[in-house]
Structures are given as structure tokens and as C-alpha cells.
């Protein structure tokens, strides 16, 4: 009985730690706008934006968030002024993730909830790739995801990991960085 209570408590803490603060539809709108502030976006992307929505296998919240983001992005006419496609994928491991991003010429990688323990290895795997990593959770940004979203005093706040942005050849304009919380 005590083990069940401890497990239940642990799961409740994990769910609270990995809950999405900013609604996914708003995340999609902010992502579409932020892409246009990356000086390298069109050169990296080419004629069409390819977004990979990464979900955790066996995690219903992760799957729901990925599907919701796909629907939200599909309703937006352009990202960074370009047409776009979105694809859902389940995470296997960091090396496979990097291979998929290279093979599919991914410009944006959206990381759904459920990956707090894998963000460091994901960061290392995609550090050499020129792509914008976007986290569904604010906690992902200090650990190496380039762009994230938080709720501060009831308002959405953009978060940017500037060190990782430079590694991934993301060059946000200074005027937009003034509006974000920057991590270095």
C-alpha cells in the first residue's frame, strides 16, 4: 500500500513538472512569428519549412501535445513567411533523432512533454545541425532547447537559450531578444 502511494505521488510530481504552461495554439503562433526573426531561417529552410514534432512513445500527454501542435501549426498559413509541413515522430534515441533531422531536412524540431531526462542528450545530438529546437516546456530551455514558452504573471513569455542558438546557427534579431528571457 505504501509503495502504491509513493508511486502515485511520484507520478503526480512528474505530471506537475511536465505540464504545459502556455496553450499549444499560442505556442504555435509564437513559433511561427519567432521563425521570421531568425536571420538564417530562410537560408536553412529553403522553399518549405519542415517541422518534426517529437513525442515520447507510451506517454499519452506527449502524444496529445504533439497532435495538438500539428493541428495548430496546420491552421497557420506560413511559418517565417514560408509554406510548411509537420510530421509526428516518436523518440527512439538521440542518434536516430539526429539522423531523422538530417535525412528529412528538418528546420524546426518541436519537443513535446515527457523528455526532461533526455534533453541533454538531444541537445548534444542536434548541436551540430542548423535547426530551431522548440520546447513545449519552459524547463527544456535552460538545458539546451533553443526556444520555449513560459507563463509569468498570467502572460506568455518567450525563453531563448542563446548559447545553444549559436551552436545551431540560429541568429535571432536583437529587437526580439529584448522581449525574451535569455539563458546563456
Where are these regions (language model features)?
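Short hydrophobic alpha-helices and adjacent helix-cap/hinge residues
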Residues: 2-184
Amino acid at each position: 500500500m505504501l509503495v502504491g502511494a509513493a508511486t502515485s505521488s511520484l507520478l503526480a510530481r512528474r505530471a506537475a513538472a511536465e505540464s504545459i504552461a502556455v496553450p499549444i495554439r499560442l505556442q504555435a503562433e509564437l513559433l511561427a512569428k519567432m521563425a521570421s526573426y531568425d536571420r538564417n531561417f530562410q537560408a536553412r529552410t529553403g522553399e518549405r519549412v519542415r517541422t518534426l514534432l517529437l513525442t515520447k512513445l507510451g506517454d499519452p500527454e506527449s502524444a496529445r501535445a504533439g497532435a495538438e501542435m500539428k493541428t495548430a501549426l496546420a491552421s497557420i498559413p506560413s511559418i517565417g513567411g514560408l509554406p510548411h509541413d509537420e510530421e509526428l515522430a516518436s523518440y527512439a534515441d538521440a542518434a536516430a533523432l539526429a539522423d531523422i533531422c538530417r535525412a528529412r531536412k528538418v528546420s524546426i524540431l518541436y519537443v513535446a512533454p515527457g523528455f526532461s531526462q533526455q534533453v541533454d542528450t538531444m541537445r548534444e545530438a542536434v548541436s551540430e545541425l542548423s535547426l530551431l529546437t522548440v520546447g513545449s516546456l519552459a524547463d527544456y530551455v535552460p538545458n539546451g532547447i533553443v526556444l520555449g514558452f513560459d507563463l509569468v504573471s498570467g502572460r506568455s513569455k518567450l525563453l531563448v537559450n542563446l548559447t545553444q542558438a549559436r551552436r545551431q546557427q540560429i541568429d535571432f534579431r536583437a529587437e526580439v531578444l529584448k522581449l525574451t528571457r535569455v539563458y546563456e
